[in-house]
Amino acid sequence: MDISQKIQKLYEQTGISPEVHDFGEKIEKSLKERFDKIDKMAELNQLKVIHAMQEARVNAECFNYASGYGYNDFGRDTLEKVYANVFHTEDALVRPQITCGTHALALTLSANLRPGDELLSIAGKPYDTLEEVIGIRPSTGSLAEYGVIYNQVDLLPDGSFDFDSIKKAIGEKTKLITIQRSKGYQTRPSFSVDQIGEAIAFVKKIKPEVICMVDNCYGEFVEEKEPSDVGADLVVGSLIKNPGGGLAPIGGYVAGRKDLIEQCAYRLTSPGLGKEVGASLGVMQSFYQGLFLAPTVVAGALKGAIFAANVYEKLGYAVVPDGKEERHDIIQAVTLGSAEGVIAFCQGIQAAAPVDSYVTPEPWAMPGYDSDVIMAAGAFVQGSSIELSADGPIKEPYAVYFQGGLTWAHAKLGILMSLQKLYEKGIV
């Protein structure tokens, strides 16, 4: 028995039928050229991260445990230099005290907006959890409660920026403009770094002093550039997504202009204290090592997303991005057209997990969302979406959002298992 036969036998032991396995093999063979390009991008970004670490003179002392106030936490301070080097920014704030991506965004917005200022989204409605942060849906402590005005410019029908409407929307009170790089729970295309750069340049011509913030979640290390390379004043993300490499157990980051990062630090801790406090509590090695591995991990996730797109496109489902499009984040949307399809897909992803594979996910009323949501994530870190995961709101158009996979082999297994569940239920 050769290795290919042994692999197929192991797939059968995990519940993958020969029909599903053979279908997947044909799709994978057609993607060799795409996968080679992804490996080259990973090599480029790996070298970029190593260079950033060398420039910051990372050493073993950076991994030491720090507690209490965290004064002179060498590892924490050096890591923030590394992030500033990676993103080519003046400064960065990278902390375990930033609990998630939504927290990082809420922190950045509340730190840099004052009563009477206007926050303008030029990419339409933001991600669901930000609706309560902003006050689109009433919530205690929202920006609206503190007198921040919110306005948005919807995207054009093709998913591109509506430059005419953006020009009209920018006014005297417009203080901060936000761009969400990834699609979130939408079926629009995600933005490329170049598209974001074009929008920022357009905005800065109209009002040079306006702050341009990019929600960078799911986009780090997908391209050779980051939004901070094309004019973003602030880029914001989560360490349990791409830059944590699957190892960071918690955390978020903000990178950008020094004066704006200072505002974020004062909001995170206290006026007068800022970046000086906030002990790292023993997580530094996982933060450094996760960042080091991130380009390779992101490459595996990208291969999984492209594989998923091609598998489901071949079966006649609408997928965003499609099987041939260039990638700008790690998320793959598949419109399955029914609640049963979304649930079966997510149950397949869960069944492929190394952790909690025996659990059957069901839709539930998740805080921050306006409909029931189903989430599949048999992850080592709870909620980690750089690990193999899938989720989606149980509402029209019944799209599921697949992302992650610390390795390509695991991402492949997840997609095959999702297809197996749909096959068993007679949906495909």
Regions found by a protein language model. Give the residues of each.
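Structural motif
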Residues: D91-V94, D117-L120, K175-L176, E209-C212, ...
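Short helix-loop-beta junction
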Residues: N85-T89, G141-V148, P354
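Conserved C-terminal alpha-helix-loop-beta "cap" of PLP-dependent enzymes
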Residues: E313-I427
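Active-site-flanking structural segment that lines cofactor/substrate pockets
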Residues: R57, F63-L93
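Conserved PLP-enzyme active-site core in the AAT-like
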Residues: I3-Q13, S17-G24, E28, K32, ...
